[in-house]
Amino acid sequence: RDRLRSRGLGDVYKRQPHTSNWDLFIGKLFYGAIGRKTSFMMKKEWFFFPLGLIFKAVGGIPVNRGRKSSLVDQMTEKFANSKHFHLAITPEGTRKANPNWKKGFYYIALKAQVPIMLIGIDYPSKTISSTKAVMPTGDIEKDMREIKLYFKNFKGKNPENFDLGNI
């Protein structure tokens, strides 16, 4: 029998590898299974009718990637003004191989003073693991190395689309 198993627990959720559109749905099922209502950021181009209504209903936050205002400040404000706010981020910024991860998730967690919960999806074993949290120290190189090392053993649906870059 094929079953999806989860291990562990733990307010920025960093989910990887992100190699397929299915990752969103699997992630939402996982968060529901652990009793977390999470928000996620997605490029605004996906928020057209009727998909936009669906994405917003399940926690989607449209992001204008060309806008100059600080997304870090916007998300930090959401943390400050919410009793419970959980944000899931896939820092590759795309479903294609990208060794240059976006670092916004790190700066959001640092500024909001919340832990980064590391959540790995492993398609071959049908497992989602959430067994590690990283509290940002301000030493981004050290912290990013620790984060990337956690994800090295996870395989996405399309493993060729996941690149850890230099560890």
Predicted regions and their residues:
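Catalytic core of membrane glycerolipid acyltransferases/transacylases, capturing the structured
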Residues: D11-R67, Y123, T127, K132-V134
